[in-house]
Structure formats: C-alpha cells, structure tokens
Amino acid sequence: MEPTWSALGLMVIVVLYIAIGAMSAAGSVYLSKLFLSAKQEQIFFGLFLIPIAGFYLAFAAHFGNKDAWPLEGTAVAIFSVLGLVGIRVPFALIVGYLLHGVWDGIHEFNALTGGPLLGPRQTTSVPLAYGFFCASYDVLIAGYFYTRRNDWHAAWSPGSAVTPREGRGVGVEVAERG
C-alpha cells in the first residue's frame, strides 16, 4: 500500500476516534446531569479518573511491556491521588483530566513515531489512535468540569441536597399527594 493511502487511512481513524471521544464526553455529561446531584457527579468523576488511568496498566500487561510497569504504575498513582483530591477540589479534577490528556498524547506520539518521548520502552504500547480518543474525552470533560466548578463548590456547603436533580433520574422521591 502506498504511504499516501496509509496516511489517509490513519487520518480517517484519528478523526473517528476524536469524534467518538467527543460523543463519549457528551454522553457522560448528559447521563451524569440526568442521574447525579452535583456532589455525586464530582465524586463519580473523581473516582472515574482512577480506572481511566489504570487502562495503561492493562495495556502494559496485554502488550507484555514489562519495562513500562514502573512509569505506568507511578502515573496511575498520581492520577489516583488527583482523582481522590478531586472528589472535594474541582481544580484537581480539571488538572487531573487535562494531564491525563497530555499522558495520552505522549503514548500516541510514541506509538505513531516509534520514538520514545520519555526514554526507551518506558511507556506501554497502546492500540492504534487510542490516545486521540482518550485525549479528546479528557480535554472536553475537563472543560465541562470548569463550567461545573461553582456548582460543585456549592454542593459541599452545609444543607446542600444529595439527591439527583429534581424531577429527573433514578432515586427521585415522588411528592406525597395531599
């Protein structure tokens, strides 16, 4: 196959992965606002950063990248701390997801160029164009967190409700008929 066709195929894959990442972010926003209160939403996305980061350990195991375990494990630990702190501090979630997008970019750079950005064999292999999908999700969801930061701060104030948005979602109590 000619290099131009290969490059064109890669561009199509990249565009599709970015679109899927954007749709995933939109779906995450829609569902979290539908079913979760502001406080629950912040907790969910804080905890969700942990398995998102953990994907790279799964990739290291799958691709047999034994040399990548120390760096990937350290990255998972850092993202886990950011996620746990983000349960109460919105800025930590914004930074955590944005940094995870950068982490995705580093892996994608290594995958596409064959050259190590951080040193030989220190990062794990990833599926083709996975970094584009994940980085688009991370950046868009971090932007959403920025718009929700004031609501999340307010949700932790004394007397704040923990139930999902009134009239929507699971677990909404029905008003008594009088």
Predicted regions, residues:
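A subset of signal/propeptide-processing and intrinsically disordered low-complexity segments
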Residues: 67, 99, 133, 168-175
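Short, highly charged, low-complexity non-transmembrane loops/tails of multi-pass membrane proteins
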Residues: 152-178
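Aromatic-rich, lipid-facing transmembrane alpha helices and their immediate juxtamembrane interface loops
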Residues: 25, 29-66, 161
